[in-house]
Regions:
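Acidic catalytic motifs of isoprenoid enzymes
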Residues: 1-166
Length: 166
């Protein structure tokens, strides 16, 4: 979804449509054949327009991810869907907010909301997976670990913002 959101050489409307379709496809359980096929078609079209070969390869490989998602346990599949739902929501917000050029995020609250959507939720996601799959992951309580994961992700996104502002 990062590739879709960040490919500024393609029209904003195309990127928004594909991001929405990816989100729809991700949340179908079981997958809808027609939607999955349309997503693959648009992804292939989108990939052909990529100038970076690794981004192109990533986009072309996307349809192979849907069966892998289905192979995950129900809990892990739900976690993937939740985190990608938050991320795509943040990316859609990015595209609508910054689609016509850079604009400042006006308040600390708006910055926190943004950094949580695109990165804090990722820290929570990985913490959740580790709690679920890594015995004795931490001696700290799970809630405290989730808060640390969230803060870590949000902090990394703030660093990305500073890096990108140069």
């Amino acid at each position: 979804t990062d590739t879709v959101a960040d490919t500024h050489t393609l029209p904003l409307e195309e990127r928004q449509h594909l991001l929405d379709l990816l989100s729809q496809t991700l949340n179908q359980d079981p997958p809808n054949v027609e939607t999955t096929r349309e997503c693959a078609r648009l992804t292939h079209h989108f990939a052909q327009q990529q100038t970076h070969p690794h981004e192109r390869a990533l986009m072309l490989a996307l349809p192979e991810c849907w069966p892998l998602l289905q192979a995950l346990s129900q809990d892990d599949r739900a976690s993937v869907r939740v985190v990608l739902g938050h991320i795509t929501q943040g990316q859609a917000l990015d595209m609508s907010r910054f689609g016509v050029g850079l604009q400042a995020i006006e308040t600390e609250r708006a910055l926190d909301d943004y950094t949580w959507l695109v990165a804090g939720c990722v820290g929570e996601f990985w913490t959740d997976l580790c709690i679920r799959h890594v015995p004795d992951f931490s001696s700290l309580p799970n809630e405290e670990m989730m808060d640390l994961g969230r803060q870590y992700g949000m902090g990394l996104q703030r660093l990305n913002i500073l890096r990108d502002s140069k």
